[in-house]
Amino acid sequence: MSKESSPERNQIMALVLCMAVLWIYPMALKKFYPAAAARPAAAPAADQAVENGEKPLSPPEGPFLEKPEAPAIIRFENNLYEAEFSTLGASVVRLVYKGDPENRDRTRAVLLNTTGEDPGLFAARFTNETTDLSRALFKLNKQDGDSFEFVYERQGQYRFVKRFFMSGTSAIINLEMEIENLSDTEKQFPVDLSLGLLAEANESTRIHDFEAVAWTDKVMASDHTRIRKKGFEVSGKIAWAGLLKKYFALLVKPDIQAMGYDVREVGHTLWADLKLEPVSVPAGQKITKQFFVYAGPQRYNTLKSFGVGFENILSRGFFGAFELLLLQAMKFSHKYTGNYGWDILLLTFLLKLLFSPLTHMSYNSMAKMKALQPRLQSIQERHKKDPTRMNKEMMELYKKNRVNPMGGCLPMVLQIPVFISFYNVLNKTIDLKGAAFIWWIKDLSEPDRLLMLPWDLPVIGHSFNLLPLLMLASMFVQQRLNPQGGMPSDQQKAFAFMPLIFGFIFYKMPSGLVLYWFLNNVLSIIQQGLVKPVVVALHHEDAKHT
């Protein structure tokens, strides 16, 4: 075999590239997210105040300059939340979503858990002050059932009131900020609001399940890996913003325009500053601003019911629309099956039917390539010293016989959007968390874990997962049934390793995803067994050479 380019080598390279796409695609997908606009460096607070026609607020005197040593912690619990409020910054330092009443264990999540020594969620500060208001010691002025009121007053300057209303029937927190101008001149109060979300212990190894989002005219998103490397800043008009992790979301919509959003990672927590446009308060007057907060599971129908666009977080990304369609189809099917495993099987079967014509075209392409092998080998032998002439004649041969040398890879390429969409749906849809299928498959969002091992093994880890091995076996069978197209023995050996590579990639994938791929392989095997052998029709000049 000549060492120059050959159709067999091209086929192998095409297949290898298809496999590589499945492995590296999540990293490449970030390129499809719109880049956030760079924010100019912020001017010093005092300079900003001068530009606005104001005198900068002078630092307060007395003990305010000292960090409060003992902020009070107020604990609260209702049907949906466990929360701890701190008088330091009038903020939430611990927030737990207790889970759906009908399924507490599967849907419970710790959304934030700080030490209480630093300001927490919903801490606010005025950016034209030289002192950080988020570290001021507020007074708990009123507590009435699910509502809390905190007050901080700077004598002769302003009175700042924060009110929290914790819903016991839906995952909603209503926040009010009241600013009263105690001075004798109109003042501007530019506010930064702090947001925070705790990552789970294993989220550092997952993709697209811990993100920052902001809505301008579309969802701007960045995962925590990108935030760690480059940061995430959005400037311009922002309607709402938030932080996401696997299954859960913290989303905030103010009733005033936000002008910027800066996100940073500290330890295992994402922190963000939502920068609001300045609030103008006349002398002796007060103004109240409202913040609508959702802190709970990422459920499409729930998010859509608010009518503010929160549901768009579930259709973000390059394949976001297809993911949403897949999710809605599974929800519809679930009304009748009551089991998400059967829903996955049903959707896999329907998708296989949809792609059947293209799969048949792929089989036809591979059969033609096999039939053309003698002609291709003849061209290679005649022009082995002239690669340009050899490649030209090979392309003419493909064109004359209407065959695409990469046609055999078509079914694999078509599965990429489905594969990625299934993966993301399994990582976003809380209803699939802990959802069992049959026999040993107890959680479709996790590896199937037939057996737990008493030790950790390389690659395998501490569990024996059977489903990826069944998938690997189905790939070997499918590979045997595919026409090899006269591949040289060394290339056939390389091709034979593809199932092993897939087995390695899929071993720790969610069992729902492996189930989809395994069933797709089984259906392909059945299809190849039922379909009659392809009758290859070559050009009459080439048919006599086969």
Model-derived regions: residue spans:
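Helix-loop-helix
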Residues: M1-D47, F85, M177-E178, E200-R206, ...
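Low-complexity, compositionally biased segments
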Residues: Q11-M13, V50, N103, R108, ...
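Juxtamembrane extramembrane loops of integral membrane proteins
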Residues: M27-R106, F150
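Short secondary-structure boundary micro-motifs
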Residues: E4-S6, S58-P60, K67-E69, L95, ...
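Soluble non-transmembrane domains of integral membrane proteins
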Residues: I73, E77-N312
